């Protein structure tokens, strides 16, 4: 009998009434590769007072309204006075800050994401914290941004919830 990882996981989940909810890959910076990448827009470092009014849908990967108290530092890309990209980091634990990134759709494919991600990683390291980057396994564009920004795969994670909750979430999608 062929006992693949997926088959073993499925049996274990069925027996426990739990199911996989989310699978993600986490990245750490490669200090031999990490460098501030350029882009054609002005980059500005932002502290909590600067981004207090930015908890909007377009910045939901960079900032988390439900966990505002963890959002520590951001780097924004500006086209004149218009914010066109935002990378934010949250203090998910004492020593590690997680980076999230958003760019307005009409400004994508201009190197903004990698410029913001790399700059925020450098700023995080300068504060004595370890930056990390996380994305869903299916988010290939985000994983490519991590690699381009100087990060390398470090670990994977899986969130497990009661099967009825996962079924309900899947019905909504």
What does each model-found stretch correspond to?
Residues 1-51:
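Acyl-donor-binding surface of acyltransferase catalytic domains
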Residues 42-69:
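Internal catalytic-core helix/loop-beta-alpha segment
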Residues 64-96, 100-104:
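A conserved beta-strand-loop-helix scaffold within acyl/acetyltransferase catalytic domains
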Residues 86, 154-156:
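Residue-level detector of high-confidence beta-strand sites
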Residues 109-123, 144, 148:
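Conserved acetyl-CoA-binding loop-helix of GNAT-fold acetyltransferases
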Residues 124-136:
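Conserved GNAT acetyl-CoA-binding A-motif
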Residues 133-147, 152, 159-165:
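Conserved beta-strand-loop-alpha-helix junction that forms the acyl-donor binding cleft
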Residues 169-170:
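C-terminal helical cap(s) of enzyme catalytic domains, especially alpha/beta-barrels
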């Amino acid at each position: 009998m062929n006992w693949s990882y997926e088959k073993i996981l499925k049996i274990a989940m069925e027996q426990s009434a739990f199911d996989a909810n989310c699978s993600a890959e986490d990245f750490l910076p490669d200090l031999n590769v990490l460098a501030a990448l350029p882009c054609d827009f002005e980059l500005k470092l932002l502290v909590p007072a600067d981004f207090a009014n930015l908890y909007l849908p377009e910045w939901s990967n960079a900032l988390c309204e439900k966990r505002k108290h963890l959002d520590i530092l951001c780097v924004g890309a500006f086209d004149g006075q218009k914010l066109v990209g935002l990378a934010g980091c949250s203090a998910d634990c004492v020593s590690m800050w997680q980076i999230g990134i958003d760019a307005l759709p009409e400004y994508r494919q201009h190197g903004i994401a990698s410029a913001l991600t790399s700059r925020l990683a450098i700023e995080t390291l300068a504060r004595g914290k370890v930056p990390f980057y996380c994305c869903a396994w299916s988010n290939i564009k985000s994983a490519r941004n991590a690699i381009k920004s100087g990060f390398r795969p470090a670990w994977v994670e899986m969130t497990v919830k009661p099967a009825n909750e996962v079924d309900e979430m899947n019905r909504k999608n």
